[in-house]
A protein has these predicted regions:
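C-terminal peripheral helix-coil segments that are non-catalytic and often amphipathic
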Residues: 1-20, 145-157, 182-209
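Short secondary-structure transition hinges
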Residues: 75, 115-149
Length: 209
């Protein structure tokens, strides 16, 4: 009987250790994936042609581990794009776009979005060429839904120009954000100056006559 109890206890311990090892393995995998994506975002902002080898070196992760997570450069860029879209969505949620005066809510939304764009400037440059502008807009569309609703709210209140279609205004805003990011990437403007220009341009685009 004692032998059976001991065997059962050993089995339970082995199962618990195996489960712990699997959990640690998953945690390590998630951590490595985050490090690789962080490194890719950082390096792409400096050099849009950065290689996978440079990404793995910056992340301090082996190339074997990198290829385990991302089979190609395109796979890495797609994963980074997906993460950037998720961060845009979170930024707009934190901006409380349904609260307060529409112009103030728009300022909060653009300031929050600009912080995300700053982290992914490399993607802003390469994705239109890599994916095409229509595909970039398609991927961003769900995340930008709060911004479109804010435009509609502003038009109904008289704060924004009601004569222009919300989708047109949203496209103009998106292009202006990308233009501001490109100015920073080229060195023509610093981040603060580009943000200031973005906010002034957006106010001029949206304001009712």
């Amino acid at each position: 009987m004692f032998r059976r109890v001991r065997r059962r206890s050993q089995g339970l311990i082995f199962t618990a250790v195996s489960r712990f090892d699997r959990q640690c393995g998953r945690a390590d995998a998630r951590r490595n994936a985050r490090r690789l994506l962080d490194a890719a975002a950082e390096l792409l902002a400096i050099d849009p042609l950065v290689s996978l080898e440079q990404v793995s070196a910056r992340a301090k992760v082996s190339r074997t581990t990198l290829y385990h997570h991302f089979s190609s450069r395109e796979a890495l860029l797609d994963a980074l794009t997906e993460r950037s879209v998720s961060e845009v969505r979170a930024a707009l949620e934190s901006a409380r776009t349904t609260e307060g005066a529409p112009d103030e809510a728009m300022r909060r939304a653009l300031e929050s979005t600009w912080q995300v764009v700053g982290r992914y400037r490399g993607l802003v440059l390469i994705n239109p060429r890599r994916l095409g502008r229509d595909e970039v807009r398609r991927r961003l569309e769900p995340a930008l839904a709060p911004l479109r609703l804010l435009i509609v709210r502003g038009q109904r209140s008289g704060a924004f120009d009601p004569e222009l279609a919300p989708d047109w205004l949203l496209a103009l805003l998106t292009d202006t954000i990308h233009a501001a990011s490109a100015q920073v990437s080229s060195g023509a403007m610093d981040t603060t100056g580009a943000e200031r220009a973005l906010l002034r341009s957006a106010a001029a685009l949206l304001s009712a006559p």
